[in-house]
Curated annotation (Swiss-Prot):
PTM sites of type Phosphoserine: 64
Organism: Influenza A virus (strain A/USSR/90/1977 H1N1)
Activity control summary: The M2 protein from most influenza A strains is inhibited by amantadine and rimantadine, resulting in viral uncoating incapacity. Emergence of amantadine-resistant variants is usually rapid.
Segments of skewed composition (Basic and acidic residues): 71-80
Domain notes: Cytoplasmic tail plays an important role in virion assembly and morphogenesis.
Pfam families membership: Flu_M2 (PF00599)
TM stretches of this protein: 23-43
MF (Gene Ontology): monoatomic ion channel activity; proton transmembrane transporter activity
Intravirion compartment spans: 44-97
Other facts noted in the record for this chain: When the channel is activated, one or more imidazole moieties of His-37 probably become bi-protonated.
Name of the coding gene: M
Protein name, as recorded: Matrix protein 2
Membrane topology per record: Single-pass type III membrane protein
Amino acid sequence: MSLLTEVETPIRNEWGCRCNDSSDPLVVAASIIGILHLILWILDRLFFKCIYRLFKHGLKRGPSTEGVPESMREEYRKEQQNAVDADDSHFVNIELE
């Protein structure tokens, strides 16, 4: 006899569960965990690009400027811009004949 016929049997043209222990706290906890797992799996599949991009890059938004005077912030911005400008000068033009 299969497990299916032992647990679920036709009752009045419907399928019902003959488990008398369905109010057991372990069964209730397992059901809740199963439902939560299914919900999390569906959300993961729907939003996996956003979720893993967040994990990969984190919440990095640059160094904190809290408590730093405005003049030093401006100096830092200029240094960063100069570094970007210096990198732009490294490109080499190659002409093919």
